[in-house]
A protein has these predicted regions:
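Conserved catalytic region of serine esterases and O-acyltransferases that act on ester linkages
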Residues: 55, 60-65, 69-261
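Extracellular serine-dependent O-acyl
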Residues: 14-54, 69-83
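Single conserved hydrophobic/aromatic residue that forms the stacking wall/gate
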Residues: 1-12
Length: 261
């Protein structure tokens, strides 16, 4: 329930509780609010605090071991409450339906926060799409310095988006990547970085400037998905990603694209 924020000052500014709670309520899912559990006492007097914001959050893994312990304790308490409570919903008695039938009815209803990207698919060097063609330009290298995550029960980390396109700063005469794709929504996934040799890239759709992708906004090794366009109908578009004017000798990595047909 807590999104891992980028710094101590915004521990809960990017917290997703407000946006995701409606989903839990609609489908009657058990929820634990770390926000409600720990933040009220952050602003209390020192002698009344159980834990400070620094103690809960601030280390490279954010939250700290202590913070993770509190989160685990909250989830464990939730399981204890579930084990000792009556599992039958009030709705199931009132409507004469089983819990499974109630849930199935909920799933047939309108989504709580939309489903525009329910069927998004990955496009990268390995996973192609017949409705897409591309010119790599100077983005012909592969980046191996990637964000890594633990997958399933594997204790070793796995690099994310290994089938990428990287501009390595050595081809200023073709410092662009061009994608022609037929879809109704498109995400660009690019690599955030804190390295000084990382540069920015301008994103254009059908010749019109949309935004500049800047790896230094987040400033750490991270996968960043940004919406390039979203339309009601499927149509063909040409997306051009080109290094910004003074960044021709810098690096930029396109990790992949997400598209909705």
């Amino acid at each position: 329930d807590v999104e891992r924020s980028r710094g101590l000052g915004d521990v809960y500014k990017r917290q997703l509780q407000e946006r995701l709670q409606p989903v839990g309520r609609q489908y009657d899912l058990p929820m634990v609010s770390i926000l409600d559990a720990v933040t009220p006492q952050f602003s209390g007097k020192e002698q009344k605090r159980v834990i400070t914001k620094n103690q809960f959050f601030y280390d490279m893994f954010h939250p700290t071991n202590l913070g993770h312990t509190i989160m685990a304790d909250c989830l464990e308490y939730l399981m204890e409450v579930c084990d000792t409570s009556d599992h039958a919903r009030v709705d199931s008695f009132r409507q004469g339906m089983t819990e499974e039938e109630v849930l199935e009815q909920c799933l047939r209803g309108e989504p709580a926060i939309g489903n525009s990207f329910e069927k998004v698919k990955l496009l990268d060097r390995r996973d192609g799409y017949e409705g897409a063609s591309m010119r790599e330009g100077g983005f012909d290298a592969t980046d191996h310095e990637l964000q890594c995550v633990e997958m399933d029960q594997d204790l070793c980390t796995t690099p994310e988006f290994p089938y990428n396109w990287m501009y390595d700063g050595t081809k200023p005469d073709r410092a662009f990547f061009e994608l022609t794709i037929t879809c109704r929504a498109l995400f660009l996934i690019f690599k955030d970085s804190g390295e000084v040799d990382a540069g920015t890239a301008d994103v254009l759709v059908d010749g019109e400037f949309r935004f500049t992708a800047d790896p230094h906004v987040n400033n750490w090794l991270h996968c960043n998905a940004v919406l390039v366009f979203q339309e009601k109908e499927t149509a063909a578009h040409t997306v051009r990603i080109q290094m910004s004017g003074e960044n021709l000798d810098k690096k930029f990595t396109i990790l992949g694209f997400g598209y909705v047909e």
